[in-house]
Amino acid sequence: MTLPIHTVLPELLATLRAQPNAVLVAPPGAGKTTAIAPALLQEPWCEGEILLLSPRRLAARAAAERMAELAGEPVGRTIGYATRMDSRRSAATRITVMTEGIFRARIMAEPDLPDVSAVLFDEVHERSLDSDFGLALALDAQGALRPELRLLAMSATLDGARFARLLDAPVIESAGAAYPLELRHVGRGDGRLEDEVARVVRQALREAEGDVLVFLPGVAEIERTAERLAGLEVELHKLHGSVPSVEQRAALRRSARRKVVLATSIAETSLTIDGVRVVVDSGLARRPRYDVGAGLTRLVTQRASQAAVTQRAGRAGRQGPGVTYRLWEAAATAGLPPFDPPEILDTDLAALVLDCAIWGAREPATLRWLDPPPVAAVQAARTQLQQLRALDEEGGPTGHGRALAALPLPPRLAHMLVEASDRARAAQVAMLLSERGLGGNDVDLEARLRRWASERGERAEAARRAAARWAKLAGEGGERQEVGALLALAFPDRVSRRRGDGADWLSAGGRGFRLDPAEPLARSDWLAVGEVQGQAAGARILSAAALTTAEVEQLFGAEISSERRVDFDRASGRVRVEHLRRLGAITLSRSQGDAREEELAAALLDAVRTHGLELLEGSDGAQAVRARAAYAGLDLSDERLLADLERWLAPALAGRRTLPPVTAEMLLALLDWPERQRLDTLAPAEFVSPAGTRHDIDYAAEGGPRVELRVQALFGLDRHPRVGDVPLVLSLTSPAGRPIQTTRDLSAFWRGSWAEVAKEMRGRYPKHHWPDQPWEAAANLSTKRRQGLG
């Protein structure tokens, strides 16, 4: 069969004879995945093995099986494959289709790639971390060790110019697919996604011929859509990473009945699903988003990129004329992002930083990247690796770090495996954390481990074999360890203690996690938490195992700190003296204690510095002093009081656990002698009346300094009293203290409205003397009889 890719093969072969690198852009269905590698085998420069890198296990296995079928050979002879869980190769194998992660491990182990003639990076537009890193390592190896090594970047929707600059290579473009493809934009209503998708699937089954491939963002949407399609006269398949391989193969094979395959992005690239002529595309994808500060990943559902929807549509036209139904309007396609964001910009970089250090690139940016790893993420990864003892202070790999890198696991899980005594069980826990759905989807890893032990499917068996290999690599140990203890080795910062009913948990690293209180694990006091997902505040626990308090004490004895804390408790208003035992942010125990006088005083002063003067209860006298100072132009502001706490507040704290009320005397102690003289001169505290009575002057009153007193106390005074040049505001009251007049001009009051006031007062208070000319009368607060007038 002649494929579109065959028209550009001569150009590609000629290019790779003349130079080591090339970039190939070929639309879906052109045949690049299965046609290029066999063609390169015949080239004179190709004396060794060809490595064809695939982004997914399913695609790697399917590509190898298809090429072997075309060659008329069984898989594992000339053409084989290698994935994390499975491998079919032999001494005769010339083409190995492998996942990008397997290639990364291989080139790290053998940087010169002995007996390898070419590395083909397929579907590089997906920009996975392993693909970008593998290409950077291959370019470095080519430049330093293997100048004759051929490197080919291939994709259907490639940003060709950028790859061409990186590889210093020409871009070769293939013609379109062999079959016509119709795009039907049907839009999406207001219903739930699965209802809308099910509606369009039924429409497609009526209008078009052939099997139907449906793209959905995740497993949950696949399950709900399957429920809505139940009862259709079709063969219904689910295709995602957790589906056992036997079921994956069934989804790929042609069936006697019409077939509907519900898939995630696993089916976007490098796969031919026999019989598919129709694609239904939701237009959505679910991507991980990494929070560097929190060290957590959350899944975000977002619009798929133009590159992704092009790949999806191409699935319909691989074996004949096809049609793609899109659940959006045609005009919206231009608004989709051109490509998926590179994974390197939004993921945990611990494994990459460790591998770079071992490679000799302590600064990853020194390698050749399409997009260099973000500086903040590199630093966070370096910190994590130093905590795991994988890197030294200079960023170089330690012996322990090299041992971790030798295992096909992320550094945390590799650390667990190396540090465990029960390495067989540790390898099994690592497998459960690596393979979603293995042993079920329980949060409790103990339950999943038991269920996996009884599973007999192909995936379960392959996982057991892989875990056994990991344990052997680490050097199998003996003494049994519980799952929680093992998990705590990998994620010590996620060891968590229950708060309340089990819905909320506090981790040693200070993060708060959430767990469904109906989960059996919610009854545990402690959890070793593995996977978490969501926002930094309140991320959801996906996998965990129970821990006992005794296990926590045993595992983290060296990390548990003892602390004596003397601090101010704002709720009670008292200084607390506590003895604390802590594991990170978790308080294990607390007890009350005693403190020295200077410690109590220091805690009270610190509380006022932290929370401000609002902690202090102010007396009327203290407020009056501050008002006088402000009137006199002296500084008793909050800023000065806070700056000089030791001078005016500290002396009053001796032996106290609570803050005292602020008195006038405390504030006056802050003023030096010239300031006190200025205060008394410009803002005297009292007004002494002609009757000899003393009255506080209110300097905070509206309108200026004010004095309230009985009008009789001012008899005999014809000149208005002043503070400096400012007349006092006199609030005059009756013998009963009721207000009768406010004045700033006493003389005018006496000669004006006093006559009416006196008339009223004589009626109300006949026992008191109310003279017609009060400025000539003697001031006296007594009744007429006591004055000898009655």
Protein language model features and the residues they cover:
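Long, charged, glycine-rich C-terminal linkers/tails
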Residues: 77-83, 486, 503, 696
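P-loop NTPase motor module signature
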Residues: 1-416, 702
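Short acidic-hydrophobic surface loop/beta-edge motif
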Residues: 172-174, 503-508, 567-568, 683-690
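Second RecA-like catalytic domain
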Residues: 235-238, 247, 280, 288, ...
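Segments forming glycine/polar-rich beta-alpha architectures that bind adenosine-containing cofactors
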Residues: 28, 498-527, 532, 689, ...
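Extended active-site and interfacial segments that coordinate phosphate-rich ligands
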Residues: 110-125, 135, 282-286, 295, ...
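Charged, non-catalytic accessory extensions
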Residues: 574-790
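Active-site lining segments that contact anionic ligands and/or coordinate catalytic metals
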Residues: 19, 322, 423-428, 482, ...
